[in-house]
Design a protein with these regions (language model features):
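Alpha/propeptide regions of enzymes that mature by internal proteolysis
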Residues: 20-375
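Bacterial Sec-dependent N-terminal signal peptides
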Residues: 1-20
Length: 375
């Protein structure tokens, strides 16, 4: 009996470890390019990520995620950027100025749908309080969202400006927390618990040696596919989010960063490829989904000064014919980031006792073995 108990406990412990491992650690290798050290958006030098997670009582299941392209005054030294809209049923704040000028001037904030105005105000406060910004009278806050209203009391608008500022302050490089954290706390993906996911790719030196990093906030539906395996079909689960959320549609926010010297035009081309990565996981960009890709170049030589003594801006940018490897790296990193979010997320119960189960990792691993998809 004692021996049997030890076996059971050992099995439970092993399954727990499997659930916490990232897909790549378990032998699921997506794509052909190598990852960075952390397989995260923070593999790009200077990029930082911070989370504030709000889990309180029975119905608060939300949070904030902040992504900083570099550690400095972004209003005074802006970075090239572009935004691609896969499906525009969303409330992304700051889009039109980025589209018009091709740069961003604040950190990127992700949160829930009804907390976008709060996050915008927090970014204004953050910017106005920075040294050298004493005369600033216009700030283009960049805030993305997904609707976490099935698990979270979204109408309560529990995210505060202090939470947003805390997420920015907590932002750091290195390993990035995934799953039920920050803006991914209350999200749902393919009918399972979604969340934050991240991944990276490093091009070989012969192709420039540049790094692509992706971070996602997954809250969308479709027919789940992992590394070419039709998981939903095999499990017999064609779970669309609408079956759970009825009229409360969600989104997928995708943040792409690279140290490659790109202008806004080629960043938009890069952003479009991220949607191909989403499609490879079985995402369908449904009518009610807000699927946005924000692409940013962190190349220091191409930062854009707010105030300059010259009228000329002379960036150094890659040629068009050097873009294809970056396109492929973006697709791979986006696909893996989404899968990472599913592996990291855990079962959650929230508002009105609504429960969303984690993806059945053990069954997924069995399928990977069945189709020889493990390295």
């Amino acid at each position: 009996m004692k021996k049997l108990l030890l076996i059971i406990l050992s099995l439970i412990f092993t399954l727990s470890l499997i659930a916490k491992d990232r897909p790549r650690d378990l032998g699921i290798e997506i794509g052909v390019f190598k990852t960075g050290k952390y397989n995260a958006i923070t593999d790009i030098k200077g990029v930082k990520v911070g989370h504030v997670t709000l889990i309180e009582g029975n119905d608060i299941r939300t949070g904030v995620t902040a992504i900083l392209p570099y550690d400095g005054n972004m209003f005074q030294m802006k970075v090239p950027a572009a935004i691609h809209i896969g499906n525009g049923f969303g409330k992304l704040a700051g889009y039109s100025q980025v589209k018009e000028l091709g740069n961003i001037e604040t950190p990127i904030i992700l949160t829930n749908t009804l907390s976008v105005p709060t996050a915008c105000n927090a970014l204004i406060t953050y910017t106005l309080d920075q040294k050298e910004n004493e005369n600033v009278r216009s700030v283009n806050s960049l805030v993305g969202e997904t609707n976490d209203g099935w698990l979270n009391d979204i109408r309560g608008r529990h995210v505060t400006e202090a939470d947003v500022l805390k997420a920015i302050k907590k932002a750091k490089g290195g390993k990035v927390e995934e799953g039920n954290v920050g803006a991914g706390t209350g999200t749902i993906c393919f009918g399972y618990k979604g969340g934050i996911g991240t991944a990276s790719r490093v091009l070989p030196k012969t192709l420039g040696g540049y790094t692509i990093g992706v971070l996602v906030q997954t809250n969308f539906g479709g027919k789940l596919e992992i590394n070419g395996v039709q998981v939903a079909e095999e499990i017999g689960d064609y779970y669309y989010r609408e079956k759970i959320l009825n009229e409360a549609d969600g989104s997928c926010m995708i943040i792409v960063m690279t140290d490659a010297p790109l202008d806004a035009r080629n960043l938009e081309r890069l952003a479009k490829r991220a949607m191909l990565g989403l499609a490879k996981t079985g995402g369908i960009a449904s009518n009610g989904s807000g699927d946005y890709v924000i692409a940013v170049s962190t190349a220091e030589e191409n930062r854009i000064p707010y105030d300059s003594e010259t009228r000329l801006y002379t960036p150094s940018v890659l040629r068009n014919d050097a873009m294809s490897p970056l396109f492929m790296a973006t697709i791979e990193a986006t696909e893996e980031a989404i899968v990472n979010s599913l592996f990291a997320a855990e079962t959650m119960t929230g508002r009105d006792e609504h429960k969303v189960d984690a993806m059945p990792v053990d069954r997924v691993m069995d399928l990977m073995k069945k189709y020889n998809k493990l390295k």
